[in-house]
Swiss-Prot record:
One cellular component (GO) term of this entry: plasma membrane
Molecular function (Gene Ontology), one example: NADH dehydrogenase activity
Upper classification of the organism: Bacteria, Pseudomonadati, Pseudomonadota, Betaproteobacteria, Rhodocyclales
Main location: membrane
InterPro entries reported for this sequence: NADH_UbQ_OxRdtase_su1/FPO, NADH_UbQ_OxRdtase_su1_CS
Enzymatic reactions: a quinone + NADH + 5 H(+)(in) = a quinol + NAD(+) + 4 H(+)(out)
Domain of life: Bacteria
Protein name, UniProt field: NADH-quinone oxidoreductase subunit H
Chain's gene name: nuoH
Length: 349
């Protein structure tokens, strides 16, 4: 430790690495929870303006205290256990749903050298951790011992597994181009090439050569997070609120925290993998975290715009899109990218 942290490190002695890691975790999780809270307000405001409404504007100036009021309300509400539910698993379900969306942030780089765990197999770690989110939904649906939660859980399991396959193939294309599983190296690999030398850095990012994979990954991310128009998991007209029917209070809030945390995670990963992360779009502007934040906010706006614009898809249409369209397209594009990399026409040489 250098500078002002050295006296603190000496104070804690051998336990300092553990304390330092815990401090870094808090430094990531605390702002994330704040972003999740105000993303709910942003969603209501954005959709309100799209529908020529005002949105929340009563609690605090311009409604800025609305997320705090909602959080206090859910915190004070009683958690009701259905008489036929398995109480232990009933509580474990929301925790299992939220935990992977928080753990995945360990390998996400926010700037050059600014990452909690600089893991060489970061991409593989992300695939492994994010695939566990479905277990929380399944456990919640089964533990509720009710038909609507169980149907919603089965829908969620099928949908999330289906779109994980196409997301995985899209990530293989990123791996082929960058030749690395380390997320920081993937970002840095997008900061070189012919377009970068010309000062047009945004044309050297992965979104251009992998445009079909960029679109597939983004749409699959919306489906993976069970957001509209892929929200048949909690289709109000059919199964009320899906796997969350029997939940109330903070147990119910944990599912919403998981959903919005996953939205932010998918958005920042899209920015890191396809949009150059913290890299500046043009050569004369400096790189920095502000570019990553701006790109992530833009992807989040697409999530909100999709919810306000598109009607809910039918369940069989969602499955058909995943298995009969996205998976064949991604398989073909993996082969195309592999052949392209070995050809003299490759733009990465």
């Amino acid at each position: 430790m250098e500078g002002f942290l050295q006296p603190v490190a000496d104070l804690f002695g051998p336990s300092w690495p553990v304390v330092w890691t815990l401090l870094k975790i808090v430094a990531i999780v605390a702002p994330l929870m704040g972003c999740v809270a105000y993303l709910t307000l942003a969603e209501r405001k954005v959709i309100g303006y799209m529908q020529v409404r005002i949105g929340p504007n009563r609690v605090g100036p311009f409604g800025l205290l609305q997320p705090i009021a909602d959080g206090v309300k859910l915190l004070l509400k009683e958690i009701i256990f259905p008489s036929s539910a398995s109480k232990g698993l009933f509580i474990v379900g929301p925790i299992l749903a939220l935990a992977p969306s928080l753990v995945a942030w360990a390998v996400v780089p926010f700037d050059d050298g600014l990452v909690l765990a600089n893991v060489n197999a970061g991409l593989l770690f992300l695939l492994a951790v994010t695939s566990m989110e479905v277990y929380g939904v399944i456990v919640a649906g089964w533990a509720s011992n009710s038909k609507y939660p169980f149907i919603g859980a089965m829908r969620a399991a099928a949908q999330m597994v289906s779109y994980e396959v196409s997301m995985g193939f899209a990530l293989i294309c990123v791996l082929l181009i960058s030749s690395s599983l380390n997320l920081s190296e993937i970002v840095n690999s997008q900061g070189s090439g012919r377009f970068h030398d010309m000062g047009l850095s945004f044309l050297s990012w992965n979104w251009l050569p992998l445009l079909p994979m960029f679109v597939v990954y983004l749409i699959s991310g919306i489906a993976e997070t069970n957001r509209a128009p892929f929200d048949v998991v909690e289709g109000e007209a059919e199964i009320v609120a899906g796997h969350m029917v029997e939940y109330s209070g903070m147990a119910f809030a944990l599912f919403f925290l998981a959903e919005y945390a996953n939205m932010i995670l998918v958005s920042i990963l899209t920015s890191v993998l396809f949009l150059g992360g913290w890299l500046s779009p043009v050569g004369f502007l400096p790189d920095g975290f502000h570019w990553l934040a701006l790109k992530t906010a833009s992807i989040l706006f697409i999530f909100l715009w999709a919810r306000a614009t598109f009607p809910r898809f039918r369940y069989d249409h969602i499955m058909r899109l995943g298995w009969k369209v996205f998976i064949p397209v991604t398989l073909v594009w993996v082969v195309v990218v592999a052949v392209w990399l070995m050809s003299p026409l490759s733009i990465w040489k």
